[in-house]
Amino acid sequence: PAPESNFVRDP
Protein backbone atom coordinates (compact mmCIF):
# COMPACT_ATOMS: atom_id res chain seq x y z
CA PRO A 1 0.00 0.00 0.00
CA ALA A 2 1.00 3.58 -0.52
CA PRO A 3 2.83 5.31 2.37
CA GLU A 4 0.15 8.00 2.27
CA SER A 5 -2.17 5.42 3.80
CA ASN A 6 -0.06 5.75 6.96
CA PHE A 7 -0.98 9.42 7.29
CA VAL A 8 -4.32 10.41 8.79
CA ARG A 9 -5.28 13.86 7.55
CA ASP A 10 -7.49 16.00 9.76
CA PRO A 11 -10.88 16.99 8.30
From Swiss-Prot:
Keywords: Neuropeptide, Secreted. One of its GO terms (biological process) is neuropeptide signaling pathway. The keyword Acyltransferase does not apply. One of its GO terms (cellular component) is extracellular region. The keyword Phosphoprotein does not apply. It comes from the Eukaryota. It is found in: Secreted. Belongs to the FARP (FMRF amide related peptide) family. FMRFamides and FMRFamide-like peptides are neuropeptides. This is Extended FMRFamide-10. It comes from Namaquaphasma ookiepense (Gladiator bug).
